[in-house]
Amino acid sequence: VETGKLGIDARWEIDIFGRQKAKSRAASNSLQASQADLYSTWVSLSAETALQYMSLRTLQEQLRITEDDVKRQQEALELIKINNQSGIINELPVQQATYALSQTQAEIPSLKKNIASTMAALSILTGTVPGEIDGLLMENTSLPTVNPHIFIGIPAEALRQRPDIQAAERRIAAQQQKTKAAKADLKPRFSLNGSIGLESFSSGGLISAIGKMIGIGPSITMPIFNAGAIRKNIKVQTEKEQEYLALYEETVLKAVGEVRNAVTDASQDHIKSEELKSAVESAQQAESLAQTNFDSGLSDYLSVLDARRNVLSARRQYIMSRGQEFADTVRLFKSLGGGWEAMDMDQEAEADSHAKK
């Protein structure tokens, strides 16, 4: 007589002390910490793209005002040559104006080279073929404006949307659940064991009977021989939890410092831009007066050139300051985790961060 069996065995652990639930929550929080790390990378990439974009607009604006100044100097040089040929003035102003024009024209190739390299960097950051977005970047070369009111009244709660803080919170929550699961290992485990299948009996090569086989019963497992190892693991998990708490505090303090510095830089550079704007206006008035004095024979042409250089220098400083102001704003938003809109996180995970051990 021969017997044969075919069936399925199953075991279901009754999670009385929350061991399996704690493990599941720990895995969920660890996943969300990884998602926050990924979001942090996205914020850094977006900020770098914005900074490169603003650098491009600053260079383009510098090129525009330099080319504009070249045209003005060329017109002035033509007028000076006419006056020289008429005997009104001598050769000195002609040479001075020619020298100044050549100096200004020499700056254009460097600006164009920097513009090309910045466009290439933007192509890399946006994942496009070099040259593909150049036409788009040349359509509107004006500098973006910055609203100074965004530096006022930043809510403290905005810090919690920083991905590094969110990741630190999720890791604390995950470690709390791991500690909870480790403590549950000291408790007995209750489970139900079940099996279902078919059993056959045969004699002489002929199947004589086929019957159903069903079995179910409870079981209990006690940590008798490995209790010492479990207690060691509990100690390890508890120490890790303290490490994550210390890391969280360090992350928060770092975030507060970064936001404070970003706000200070942005607000002070805005004040600097306003002062430089006034400086440009004063330099333009001084240039007009110098030109009038030269036309009246009250001063030489060198004073006109000095005044014109001051205008160009003031305009460049103003453009660079506006670019720096925008860069400060980008860094401010980066320090806030990409803005004031909180990252979309699972609502249940928020409750998990306050779960008890």
Task: Name the predicted role of every residue range.
Residues E13, E48, T128, P155, ...:
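Short loop-to-helix capping motifs
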Residues V1-T3, R11-S40, L136, Q166, ...:
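Small/polar (Gly/Ser/Thr/Ala-rich) solvent-exposed segments
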Residues L143-A173, P223-I224, E249-V252, V263, ...:
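Bacterial Sec-pathway N-terminal export signals of envelope proteins
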Residues T41, L45-D68, R72-I82, T98-A100, ...:
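Amphipathic alpha-helical coiled-coil segments
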Residues Q85-A116, Q317:
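Repeat-solenoid scaffold signature
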Residues D9-R11, A181, S219:
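Outer-membrane beta-barrel architecture
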Residues D68-K71, I88-N90, P109-L159, D300, ...:
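Short, solvent-exposed, mixed-charge loop/turn linkers that connect secondary-structure elements
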Residues T3-K5, L51, Q96, G153, ...:
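Transmembrane beta-barrel architecture of outer-membrane proteins
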